[in-house]
């Protein structure tokens, strides 16, 4: 068992998948602009994207869903006019998978078969395994060749280089994901990472609503032990009172969510994010 898999096994309460799905639904434009700028620039954003959950569930049901994997399928219109509409399949992969590229190829073909539309597949690698960034599925025998090449965004590489001082929402959520993985099994390390990320939000120029939205996503993703959750709650309350900035503590669920079942808190988080829109 690799260190990464062992860490994941120790951290089953953190809901990376749920946080990512909620974030992508609410901030698709921002995430595409940061993670895949060339794709973002090719889309006609005057037309509202359409989510294709039913079609995606058919493909995943046939191919089989893996752990630590988030898939979204959305129909968008291109600026080029080559095709009025295409399907963008975006997958976020939080752990190493040996047959990742071939499964991506299978999904791409399955979506095309079900929807009869061209599919643009994008992959966000949100794992800790350096040097692992598959971006092509290739099968060749004699004169026959099948090749699928897809864009990849490796979060840990960007965070260590060009995103080091980037505090946009997509970069912050990437940082929360990587910090959560790095501190799996390290309760105090997770607490410090989450505390630094949350308290740092107030000095980044975000509005009150934006701070709440980011906090709710980070809170969803970076689960803490109950005693450390309570300690962080106290620190946030004191911090906001000192600054007279009741951004997070004015969210109705803030105090009560800490003492309830994590599953209920996750469901309420999704509702609260919708209310903040």
Protein language model annotation of sequence segments:
Residues 2, 245-248, 268:
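Low-complexity, intrinsically disordered short peptide segments enriched in small/polar/basic residues
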Residues 32, 86-94, 153, 250-272:
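Short strand-loop-helix active-site module centered on a catalytic nucleophile
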Residues 193-194, 214, 232, 268-272:
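N-terminal alpha-helical segment
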Residues 215-258, 262:
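Long, amphipathic alpha-helical segments that form or neighbor coiled-coils/leucine zippers used
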